[in-house]
């Protein structure tokens, strides 16, 4: 992620005066929720994952799913508040001196794009720690490489580099790619069937709300028709597969 941040700041210097400041302020504001979440939930998860790494795979996944449910209940409302009040928060904190109204709007636009990446930052931390607990240290390295590659494709291939809002959006989407890759590796380590059979209803509900949020995020992108279709189909398949496995499990018991 830090490499992406450096590239982002370098590209921002080529847009307009003050772009680096807008991105830096927006990024710092977005990390406030991240800091609260890490201090409150993610750090205690690390100890539980290390303790449960030698247990049954189903028990290990139940620990992950349980913590993800509680984190989603905290982080999603916080993200919604920041999205709704991004301009007001930026204006209250920084509208003084040479920081004018145009700077407020640019910073708030970047903040909105960064906010969508905050849940995926949390997932990256949790999935990485889970894979390390399972002695699969190579997978997080591969996922980080995929994140950097996807960011480069977005800013240079799709040319999302002509505004601070698009640069921040590319950074958030790269985090989404990284979290998805890590989740795929975790499914591979725990066996896909084990994970699907042990999804509780809170995790499924949080998955649905997260998919709705991501869909609306992708709706504003230039290539929304392609990504929205693929993501919507994938998340729908995953949701109904989880329901089917839980139904079959209840029938057996």
PLM region spans:
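Interfacial transmembrane-helix starts/ends
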Residues: 24, 45, 56-85, 104-111
